[in-house]
Amino acid sequence: MQLDKKIINHVHCLGIGGIGVSALAEILLKKGCRVTGSDVSPNKNTERLQRLGAEIIFNHDGTAITQADCAVYSSAIGATNPELMAAKQAKIPLLKRGEMLANLMKEYQSIAVAGAHGKTTTSGMLSHAFVEANLDPTFMVGGVLNNSQTPARVGNGHYFIAEADESDASFLFMHPDIAVVTNIDADHLSTYDGDFNRLKQTYIQFLEQTAQDGVVVLCLDDPILREIAPLLSRRVITYGFSSDAQYRVVDYCQQGIQSLFQIHSPQRKAPLTVKLSMPGQHNALNATAVTAIADVVQMNEPALLKSLADFPGVDRRFTIRGEMILPKGNALIIEDYGHHPNEIKATLAAARAAWPERRMVLVFQPHRYSRTRDLMTEFVSVLAETDWLVLLEVYSAGEMPIPGADGMALIKMMSNGMAQKTTFVPLLQNLPETLQKLSQPNDIIILQGAGNIGSIVTALVQTYG
């Protein structure tokens, strides 16, 4: 449906505590809408929204939605949700989160960042650059920016930067002026009936919905995007480590948790020297995508370089949380949201490069039974790269258990060599005690996953650090 601002004054948000819906609610509040919402329990997102004026109840009994002009929901809301059913009965217009976002973006020059991995950091880095360059953007990303402590902002400038979600194919609501895709991977295949080719074709459709005079920015290191690039009718800009990328990363090196590299591009006679306050080649790629877009909008180069150098990152993306005190020293605790084998691999590589002499203890909470089943072999391979694996039970994210796709099944798939350095912790609350027993001074402890593993971080550092 189209969003008519003359009649839409009150929006009700189902699952308002989720990062995506909470960011949308924040933008609506700052645009003057009355926002009500519901969720099962309070969290930092709901607390932030309540301070901004949102009216939130913590149940889904269907009583709070009846007076709204429209209701917004995410893919996390099931068809039998009482509020969703009440809205349908009351004939209240229902919009998916992505549909409402796309409606808001129509008022601006829009930039949509998609991809299986890296889209939150890239969109956050891009938003930070636009702010630093005084372009006063509106943005909505899939994580809390560490500098502003918010996933959203309403500015007075011409640009709207948003993360585009392929997990439920809702990015098809968007018709951006600039579209970015960081990579394409076999994830969220349940949305695409298990058909990777259908996923690929959906990405092509998304990119072809870019404005006729718009720009598509693709990472040429990704084999699927390399295949797609020549098929597109829009102007394409490529980036990557690949020698034939238009924006090419060269001379990459990592010093501690900082990255140094150069970008060769058709816009410059001399390479651009970039310092990034984040580790990992994957973040160098993210910064290169930002650089390509900055050139498209003719951003001031000194402002761009400053923004990349001082970008503080996104919460739960290689975030250093503190130290856990041990009897004879301390262990450093890092939290990372990555939950796909390729994301785990990138996190481990960045940590190894930052602390090559220190032991890596990876605490991994698998996310969704379906993903664990579909990528079991890939998980086994990447988890073998750590020095000690602490495996938690699968975080269901609302899915029913799948036989052969739980934590114990993953443990059984590990090799004999891996079994000697693997600990299975079925209950999250037992994790602090387990880590106290197995950790050594100077360990790097990485808490990895998109589920509720983050809830233990504060207790872990406060109790033991």
UniProtKB/Swiss-Prot annotation:
Q: Which PANTHER family match?
A: UDP-N-ACETYLMURAMATE--L-ALANINE LIGASE (PTHR43445:SF3), UDP-N-ACETYLMURAMATE--L-ALANINE LIGASE-RELATED (PTHR43445)
Would you tell me the protein name for this molecule?
UDP-N-acetylmuramate--L-alanine ligase
Q: What is the originating organism of this protein?
A: Coxiella burnetii (strain CbuG_Q212)
User: InterPro entries from the entry?
Assistant: Mur-like_cat_sf, Mur_ligase_C, Mur_ligase_C_dom_sf, Mur_ligase_cen, Mur_ligase_N, MurCDEF_pg_biosynth, UDP-N-AcMur_Ala_ligase_MurC
> What is this protein's function?
Cell wall formation.
Gene field: murC
Kindly list the residue ranges recorded as spanning the membrane: none
Keyword Chloroplast among record annotations:
no
Tell me a GO biological process for this protein. regulation of cell shape
Q: Which HAMAP family match?
A: MurC (MF_00046)
Query: Which domain of life does the protein's organism represent?
Result: Bacteria
Q: Where does ATP bind?
A: G115, A116, H117, G118, K119, T120, T121
What is catalysed by this protein?
Answer: UDP-N-acetyl-alpha-D-muramate + L-alanine + ATP = UDP-N-acetyl-alpha-D-muramoyl-L-alanine + ADP + phosphate + H(+)
Query: Major place of localization?
Result: cytoplasm
